[in-house]
Design a protein with these regions (language model features):
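Phosphate-end processing signature that detects enzymes handling 5′-triphosphorylated RNA
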Residues: 1-255
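Active-site-proximal "nucleotidyltransferase
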Residues: 214-316
């Protein structure tokens, strides 16, 4: 992964501060607005599994966020169903915390890779904390945002990969939640799911120095990006756009210039050949079908070779 000097310096600073503040969480998310499509989501999951990362079992969870950024989490489908019926949190086992931005540089956007690195402060709250009791005492009147999460987690060296399918409270055009008081005030269950992929840096022997933490974090981000780009050699978005523009100028079109496949019929294989009908018995070499990606080789003005597939995706 290639970073500009300013990006690399900011990332080093963020990671260094993370090692000094145990209450901070450092993670990266991928795709426009932190979302990817279902196809790329599955591709990344398959890659992580094939690479031998350890799968960690996860239960479904429901997170409930209030206006003051206090987050409550219920774990387990039985507990979630019970809450959806009565909208009561008191008397149920929950996890409470305050999660907000931390540090001078709380976000770092790597636009060329559609990746955002986020620093957040997590403050756990006990069930008997005065702030929790105050919220629970007016729970029915509290405005809330819900996120129903089904998650698959893989553990690597110093990082964990969270792949989540999320159904949540609706958002307005500015990306802010349309707050509700009860889970059933919106049809969250039937809403279209969104797909999220996150890489989180975890504390341990593999991340106990800034250098080791930075190495683990970059490696984890690179694994996800290789799955998203479907190639081992990562490439900047700006490079892909530049190469595609050069290809369009060269061919004078925005289409894949390879020969289109044709479905073979019996007449294309008969011994008695018909005039004007292509026949495999003359001028063709028949081989077993080779599965793979069909690409064109394209050399840009700098002499660098790229591959372009039928969907006009660019590979180095």
């Amino acid at each position: 992964m290639e970073l500009f000097s300013a990006e690399a310096e900011t990332l080093r600073k963020i990671v260094s501060e993370w090692t000094e503040h145990p209450e901070r969480e450092l993670e990266s998310c991928f795709g426009p607005k932190g979302q990817v499509d279902a196809t790329r989501f599955l591709t990344v999951a398959q890659r992580l599994k094939a690479k031998g990362y350890t799968a960690l079992p996860q239960e479904d969870r429901l997170t409930i966020t209030t206006l003051d950024n206090t987050r409550f989490t219920l774990v387990g489908m039985g507990l979630i169903q019970q809450y959806c019926r009565d909208n009561r949190l008191a008397g149920k086992p929950f996890i409470a915390m305050i999660k907000d931005r931390a540090g001078v540089e709380s976000n770092l956007d790597l636009d060329d890779y559609e990746t955002r690195i986020k620093v957040r402060r997590e403050v756990p709250l006990a069930a008997d904390d005065a702030r929790v009791k105050d919220i629970l005492s007016t729970w029915a009147q509290q405005k809330k945002a819900f996120r129903l999460i089904r998650r698959w987690t893989f553990q690597g060296k110093g990082v964990i990969f969270d792949l989540s399918i999320v159904r949540s409270t609706k958002k307005d055009l500015r990306g802010n939640y349309v707050w509700v008081r009860n889970f059933l005030d919106q049809d969250i269950i039937s809403s279209a799911p969104i797909y999220e992929i996150e890489v989180e840096l975890i504390r341990g022997a593999d991340t106990d120095t800034p250098e080791k933490a930075l190495s683990s974090f970059i490696k984890g981000i690179g694994e996800v990006l290789r799955g998203l780009q479907k190639h081992t050699l990562l490439m900047r978005k700006s490079t892909s756009i530049r190469v595609l523009d050069a290809y369009k100028d060269f061919v004078g079109d925005d289409k894949f210039r390879g020969v289109a496949p044709v479905t073979l019929e019996l007449k294309n294989m008969m011994k008695d050949q018909q005039p004007g009908v292509p026949n495999l018995r003359t001028g063709y070499n028949v081989t077993d079908k080779a599965d793979g990606l069909r690409v064109l080789g394209f050399c840009d003005g700098n002499g660098e070779l790229f591959m372009i597939d039928m969907a006009l995706n660019i590979y180095r």
